[in-house]
Swiss-Prot record:
Keywords: Acetylation, Heme, Iron, Metal-binding, Oxygen transport, Phosphoprotein, S-nitrosylation, Transport. This is Hemoglobin subunit beta. The gene is HBB. It comes from Nycticebus coucang. Belongs to the globin family. Heterotetramer of two alpha chains and two beta chains. The modification S-nitrosocysteine is found at C93. InterPro entries: Globin (IPR000971), Globin-like_sf (IPR009050), Globin/Proto (IPR012292), Hemoglobin_b (IPR002337), Hemoglobin_oxygen_transport (IPR050056). Involved in oxygen transport from the lung to the various peripheral tissues. SUPFAM superfamilies: Globin-like. The modification N6-acetyllysine is found at K59, K82, K144. Gene3D superfamilies: Globins (1.10.490.10). The modification Phosphoserine is found at S44. Heme b binds at H63, H92.
Length: 146
């Protein structure tokens, strides 16, 4: 991902304020509510029968934290996202058979959640930088797909 120095600073400054537990759980939960067909990958998570069930599901929250921790790791390696996410790309492609479009959807949901959490601090410039990052991460995760 090519970010200007200003964009990198904006991404890093905001990310320093992110509560990975809360934001991760909310982002994954929203993905499952807004795009219900994505739930098929999480059937082992138990009750996903309603928006409140999804948003309150401890397995959704725990996996959301895991997802956002990996995203956080990616922020430390913006110059090598494909390398950083190679193993996860392989896992999601070969073993889990996740549609790579879901990575783009989750990235966009993450941007919505960040805007929700940070309000005025999530300026159009910050959003622009984050859109580049989530697109780069989605592309890296889709890299191993044939």
């Amino acid at each position: 991902v090519h970010l200007t120095g200003e964009e990198k600073s904006a991404v890093t400054a905001l990310w320093g304020k992110v509560n990975v537990d809360d934001v991760g759980g909310e982002a994954l939960g929203r993905l499952l509510v807004v795009y219900p067909w994505t739930q098929r990958f999480f059937e082992s998570f138990g009750d996903l029968s309603s928006p409140s069930a999804v948003m309150g599901n401890p397995k959704v929250k725990a996996h959301g934290k895991k997802v956002l921790s990996a995203f956080s790791d990616g922020l430390n390696h913006l110059d090598n996202l494909k390398g950083t996410f190679a193993k996860l790309s392989e896992l999601h492609c070969d073993k889990l058979h996740v549609d790579p479009e879901n990575f783009r959807l989750l990235g966009n949901v993450l941007v919505v959640v960040l805007a929700h959490h940070f309000g005025k601090d999530f300026t159009p410039q910050v959003q622009s930088a984050y859109q580049k990052v989530v697109a780069g991460v989605a592309n890296a995760l889709a890299h191993k797909y044939h």
